[in-house]
């Protein structure tokens, strides 16, 4: 996976742009990582595209120029591999996370609908539950599977407020527009004054963030260098500081 130093230096001299498509829940962390990468690679600019993982793969399939893909689950990266959108030999897990059930924490909403656990979502008082769209948002798929495993999906499904990304769920919670919602632990930590975690939700599969170089990367050498940087201590420190679990070797 190592990029040629000569290729990287050539890209720097040309003022190259490396395009990174990253899952929405990684947005804030990836912006900081991108800044650190740019400081270490003078002349290179990172263009960050943040959206739901499924949307990112759709964009690639439609021909969007991407150098590195970072998804929020293995299944989405598996799909990208099947469609030959990424180089499977470069695939690495860069971080982990946890799914949580959260509620609004603003004073004017606290206590209106008592939600203390997953089971409370089945009570009549709970009318609006935000989750990411399971077809494109990995956190939404994790949430649906957790509700199904708890025998709550049939009850909760009519109350669901669908979201285009996990960050949109967070916005709904922060504004008190829903009674509860499923986000990642790191998302809830970004809004401690407005969002409160009530339960870490067991998931059928670990929440992992795989990354890979795009098969048609416009800047393949820089793409490999950026992926290497994601696994380096400076980038991992950023991810740890924002609550992500360590990368898996």
What is the meaning of each model-derived region?
Residues 4-41, 45-54, 58-62, 71-74, ...:
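Exported/periplasmic ABC-transporter solute-binding proteins
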């Amino acid at each position: 996976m190592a990029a040629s130093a000569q290729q990287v230096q050539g890209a720097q001299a040309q003022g190259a742009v490396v395009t990174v498509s990253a899952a929405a829940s990684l947005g804030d962390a990836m912006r900081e990582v991108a800044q650190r990468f740019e400081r270490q690679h003078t002349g290179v600019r990172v263009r960050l595209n943040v959206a739901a993982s499924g949307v990112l793969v759709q964009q690639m399939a439609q021909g969007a120029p991407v150098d590195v893909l970072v998804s929020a689950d293995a299944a989405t990266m598996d799909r990208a591999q099947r469609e030959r959108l990424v180089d499977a030999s470069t695939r690495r897990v860069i971080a982990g996370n946890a799914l949580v059930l959260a509620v609004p924490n603003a004073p004017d909403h606290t206590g209106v609908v008592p939600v203390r656990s997953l089971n409370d979502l089945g009570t009549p008082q709970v009318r609006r539950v935000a989750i990411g769209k399971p077809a494109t948002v990995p956190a939404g798929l994790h949430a649906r599977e957790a509700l199904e495993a708890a025998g709550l999906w049939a009850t909760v499904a009519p109350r669901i407020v669908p979201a285009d990304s996990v960050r949109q769920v967070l916005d709904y919670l922060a504004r008190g527009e829903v009674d509860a919602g499923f986000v990642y632990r790191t998302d809830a930590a970004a809004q401690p004054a407005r969002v409160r975690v009530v339960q870490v939700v067991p998931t059928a599969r670990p929440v992992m963030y795989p990354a890979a170089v795009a098969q048609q990367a416009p800047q393949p050498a820089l793409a490999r260098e950026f992926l290497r940087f994601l696994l380096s201590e400076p980038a991992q420190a950023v991810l740890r500081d924002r609550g992500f679990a360590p990368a898996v070797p």
